[in-house]
């Protein structure tokens, strides 16, 4: 699932075709779809490579038992065909410890909706008003190993239905931090059936049961707010 590399000017400027789309407005054959890779190297201005890990850990605060904890918001970006935009990333310490997940990230002082659309713009270049977000549709509690430590995260998931034009004009890796550039590898559109096929071949997707969840969210959310607990400590 390797992706074509994307130059810095493409990541911060005008058009990069995401897999499965074409400029004429149609959909490319899914079997020919390939992800769009993230340009490696420095992130935002002022973030030296030696401080990348520390800057990532600054987003977390000790929980009651001392485990690093943060709140996060995520956006399930769905195109008119019901495909979801996912990000492929890996651990700081182990490139083979990798998985696919939805757009989003840690929250600052802002609310979940505001944080979700901020993360959406930073990671994809797509700007959306918080009022366009549907949900929350999923509340996820997660405890996992990352950067050689156990961390804990509570996530709120929203749906954003994008137009074909928004999907085609997305700019993967638009404004990533240095930590994100180091650990994020690829953006790609996925159909639920493709997710199931990839899982059968050994790929990991979060949240657990993502393909089935998408089918409850598209073409219309069934109105149920689901709760998921994931533990990935190995």
Language-model features, listed with the residues they occupy:
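Short connector loops at helix/strand junctions that flank enzyme active sites
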Residues: 70, 97-102, 151-155, 182
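Short, P/G- and charge-enriched loop/turn segments at secondary-structure junctions
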Residues: 56-65, 144-148, 174-177
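Acidic, metal-coordinating catalytic segment for phosphate/diphosphate chemistry
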Residues: 2-10, 46-80
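Intrinsically disordered, low-complexity terminal tails and inter-domain linkers enriched
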Residues: 1-52
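A short coil-to-beta-strand element that immediately follows conserved catalytic motifs
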Residues: 127-138
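Nudix hydrolase/Nudix homology domain
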Residues: 2, 7, 18, 93, ...
């Amino acid at each position: 699932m390797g992706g074509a590399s994307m130059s810095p000017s493409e990541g911060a400027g005008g058009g990069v075709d995401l897999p499965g789309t074409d400029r004429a407005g149609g959909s490319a054959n899914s079997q020919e779809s390939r992800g769009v890779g993230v340009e490696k190297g420095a992130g935002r201005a002022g973030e030296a490579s030696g401080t990348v890990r520390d800057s990532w850990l600054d987003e977390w605060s000790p929980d009651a038992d001392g485990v690093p904890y943060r709140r996060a918001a995520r956006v399930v970006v769905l195109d008119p065909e019901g495909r979801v935009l996912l990000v492929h990333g890996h651990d700081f310490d182990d490139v083979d410890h990798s998985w696919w997940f939805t757009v989003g990230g840690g929250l600052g002082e802002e609310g979940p909706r505001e944080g979700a659309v901020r993360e959406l713009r930073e990671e994809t270049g797509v700007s959306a008003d918080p009022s366009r977000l549907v949900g929350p549709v999923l509340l996820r509690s997660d405890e996992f190993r990352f950067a050689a430590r156990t961390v804990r995260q509570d996530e709120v998931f929203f749906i954003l239905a994008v137009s074909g034009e928004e999907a085609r004009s997305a700019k993967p890796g638009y404004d990533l931090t240095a930590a994100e550039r180091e650990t994020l590898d690829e953006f790609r559109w996925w159909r639920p059936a493709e997710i199931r096929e990839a899982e059968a071949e050994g790929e990991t997707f979060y949240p657990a049961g993502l393909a089935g969840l998408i089918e409850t969210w598209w073409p219309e959310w069934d109105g149920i707010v689901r709760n998921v607990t994931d533990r990935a400590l190995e």
